[in-house]
Amino acid sequence: VAAVKAGAAPLDAIICNAGVMAIPEPRQAFGWELHLFTNHIGHFILVTGLLDRLASPGRVVVTASNAHRRAPAAGIEFDNLTGVRGYEPMRAYGQSKLANILFTRELGRRLGTKGQTANTLHPGVISTGITRTLPGLAQAAMRMASPLVLKTAAQGAATQCYLAASPAVASVTGAYYADCNPSETTPIARDMTLAAKLWAESEALVARI
């Protein structure tokens, strides 16, 4: 964040794409389960730290996933942020992807009429290194399927680029996209009370780091 802020030019877009997936055992960073910390808090720190450098108009694009459908029934388990209770790798990943969507919706609300937008997306199932923590059999199956059903990295980036640059979505904010089109989320991913609570909990954690 500091290195980017040291530059002179404003930012036309901030694209959040870092992530981890399917870590076999529960691990934590600063007391938060590692998927949730890396995939959500990392982006929260980056975006909130750079908002004062975001141009107007400017855009924030956050990579989520349809895996948000695998999040816990409560959405975000605030009483289990360590992730130790009932840990399951894809459930933890799903919670982090739900957090991406909730964060983006709340950010879009906060940006309001500033001429800045925030949107999120499902990139598709892509042949990248993020699957490296999957069990060996699952990795082998994905390698076999890759030429037939998996997107390339370039194809997976298409919706990110669309949301970051297309005039067609210049006034769209707080939305979820897939394959460059609006897409549906689970009802809990549209819960603005939950989104506001996640923002507050995220701010509290970042203040302690």
Predicted segments, located by residue:
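C-terminal helical subdomain
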Residues: T63, S96, T120, R143-T185, ...
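Intracellular terminal tails of multi-pass secondary transporters
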Residues: E203-I209
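A generic alpha-helix structural signal
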Residues: V1, W199-S202
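A short C-terminal helix-loop "cap" of Rossmann-like NAD(P)-dependent dehydrogenase/epimerase domains
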Residues: L81-V84, G136-S146
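Residues at helix-coil transition
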Residues: A6, A164-S166, A207
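Rossmann-fold NAD(P)H-dependent dehydrogenase/reductase core
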Residues: V1-L134, I209
